[in-house]
Amino acid sequence: WNMEERFQGHQDSPLTETGRRQVTALGRRLKAMAFDRLISSDLGRTRETAAIIAQYTGHTVHADRRLRERHYGVLEGLNAKEIHEQHPGVYQELITENPDYVIPEGQTHRQHYHQNIEVLNEWAGGTPGTTAALVAHGGVLDNFFRHVAHLDLRHPRCVLPANASISIIQHGTFYGSLRWVIKTWGDAAHLETLEPH
């Protein structure tokens, strides 16, 4: 679905063989990193990712539906061209970046954003000194980035981390104020040695 640039949302698909190889490399790398909890979206593709990681790190996987990708309703399974042809009014709303537009049978960007940030604050920001690894989707990572960088929800997506990459955000006191900061974004060094298939 990613390779075809389809709006996947809550629809599911298994990892490809390339995806499994990437996640295996990620698991090997995360084995050397200390963290307390492993939390995943409850969708199959992220649960599969988290299960592979857990084979290397030994963590129990906690599934949280609030880490799901945005619910794209009638758009799920379609690419931009198909959306433009089949749902021209919805397409026009999407390109305006209106965070309060409700996709038919789906949700608004603002609803998705708030559920994602709730998880971030609860799992990773709730207890001082706690480190959590969150296995999530591109839209969720985009919302985390927006939250930390204080970007308006109308701002177009400006970061596209690679699949199976590592992004680290930290909650703490920096320069005298308590806040989230981005330490690393989209680090995919562990994927550089993979042979292409």
Identify the meaning behind each predicted range.
Residues 35-42, 131-135:
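Short glycine-rich phosphate-binding loop at a beta-alpha junction
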Residues 31-34, 123-130:
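Glycine-rich phosphate-binding loop signature in dinucleotide/nucleotide-binding domains
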Residues 14, 55-118, 181, 195-197:
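Phosphate-handling substructures
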Residues 52, 143-147:
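Active-site signature of alpha/beta-hydrolase-fold catalytic machinery across serine-
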Residues 152-176:
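Domain-level recognition of soluble alpha/beta enzyme cores
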Residues 1-37, 48-51, 55-59, 74-81, ...:
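An N-terminal RHG(E/S)-centered segment typical of histidine phosphatases
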Residues 22, 26, 46, 112-120:
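Alpha-helical packing segments of well-folded alpha/beta enzyme cores
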